[in-house]
Every structure is written in structure tokens, then in C-alpha cells.
Amino acid sequence: MELKRENVLIEALPYMQEFYDSIMVIKVGGNAMVSAQIMEDIIKDIVLLRYVGIKPVIVHGGGPEITEKMERMGKKAEFFQGLRITDDETMEIARMVLVGNINTKIVSLIGLFGGKGVGFTGYDGRMILGHKQAAKHVLIDGVETEVDIGWVGESEVINPEILHIMLEKGYIPVISPIAVDAKGNALNINADTVAGDIAAALHAKKLILMTDVSGLLRNIKDPGSRISRVKLDDIDLLIEEGVISGGMIPKIKGAAVAVKSGVERAHIINGSVSHSMLLELFTDGGVGTMIY
């Protein structure tokens, strides 16, 4: 039975009161931005959060767009354990897509819907300092093999001062997941990981990871198998069982880092479902997976 509109608003009130003046880091994944309408709906919801007194920070991905751009340029996208293998050319393509296209588009939409957006990368103000990940040693057909995933980084230090300044002035920061190392090299860092690290550095109340599935599914082919709550202690077992796999691994690990570092809750939700973020935040039932 559908709730009356006034009941929905009353149900939302205690959550709005609880979250007032709190910071929420929202990762908008490329897979959640499969159409212009979905993107607009997500940004409208984020601007609404700002208007009800919440301080949102956006970290965006762009995986499908990067892959599409690579294919148009005749280059095959390759992945290892959910991370994009990033050689010099792929790094340049990623910067072109993330900074020149997606970031500016999100900032523009925020302005269109009455908010104040400002774009950043991790190397602006040395916000995200990192290092290149070491080569991976894995068994392939019983033979130990070294896999170099290129300019894929891990963050070492998050400098959130500029974000605090922007939030206090009413801006919505929009961050591309590109870091810088000690030598000034750009690093491609998984956006879920960046979002978790930034949420921890900002002491955010919530980390919200938006993707194209309705949270963590016990059976990826069955939307009804959603796991609504995951404890930190259960994550390793779920990875061993294969329930958490592929691109969901960095999402869950990013969420776990954030929660272990003091973020109260992390949520994985389906951004392609209309207003799913508002339903997750402001209703009793929720629509995604909560990590705590």
C-alpha cells in the first residue's frame, strides 16, 4: 500500500533533524549515470540535501565513459581484481574523461538546479597524495605471474582543508578520483576507494556509494537476494564465498575503511532507481545495503 505524501514527509523529519549540518560523501558511479535523466535526478537529490542543511561532497567515477572513449580510440580496456589496468595512454584518457567531461557536467548541473558546485581533482591543493600500487603476484594456471596494473594508485594522505572551506561557504565539492604522487605523476584511484578515504578524512556521518545494482546481492542474477545489512566482521567471509566479487570488492573495502575510521554508516544503493538516495536516507525501510 502506497504511503500518503504527508506520511512520507513526516517519516523523513527525524532523519532530517539527525543529519542536519552533517557531512555526507556521495560516490556517483559511472554505471549509475547511464542516462542524462538519471544523472539529473541524482544531482537534484544532492542539491536538495544541501537545502535541508546537509553538506554533500560528491566523488564521481566514470568507468563506462572511459571504456567507451578507449574503444573509440581503438584501445582495449583491461581489468584486474576490479581495477582498471592503467598505462600512460589510459591515464591520459581517464583524465580527459573524468576532469574534462564528467566533472564539469556535474558542476554545471548543480548550478542549473540552484546549488553551487565546484570541481576538484586530487592534485588540486595536493588534496589526495598517493603512491603507485606495487605489481601483483598471482597464480595463473598454476604459475606465479607478476601483473603490473600501471598508474593505479593508493591514497596515503587526504588533505581535506579546502573541502571544509568550500562546505562552510555553501558549495558542493565535486571530486575526480585522480591523485598525485611525490614526483607529480597522476594516479588513477578507484572512485569507491577515494570516496571512502575522503569520508574518513572529513569525519563524515555517511558514505553513500551509488551504482547500478540494488546493493550487495547474494545472487547477482536475483535482485530479490539483496543483503540489507553487512557487519564489518562478515566482509572477509563474503569475499571468500564469492558473494563480494569483481567491482563490488573495492566498493565494500572502501566502505569498510570509512566505517573503521569513524564514519557512522556506509550505504550501497542503486543510483538508477529514481530518488533511491532519498529513500535510503529518509525512510525506515531503506533500499540498499548498509555497512556498519
Curated annotation (Swiss-Prot):
GO terms for cellular component: cytoplasm. It catalyses: N-acetyl-L-glutamate + ATP = N-acetyl-L-glutamyl 5-phosphate + ADP. It is found in: Cytoplasm. Gene3D superfamilies: Acetylglutamate kinase-like. It is an enzyme of class 2 (transferase). Keywords: Amino-acid biosynthesis, Arginine biosynthesis, ATP-binding, Cytoplasm, Kinase, Nucleotide-binding, Transferase. Substrate binds at residues 62-63, 84, 188. Pfam families: AA_kinase. Its EC number is 2.7.2.8. CDD domains: AAK_NAGK-C (cd04250). Belongs to the acetylglutamate kinase family. ArgB subfamily. This is Acetylglutamate kinase. It comes from Methanosarcina mazei (strain ATCC BAA-159 / DSM 3647 / Goe1 / Go1 / JCM 11833 / OCM 88).
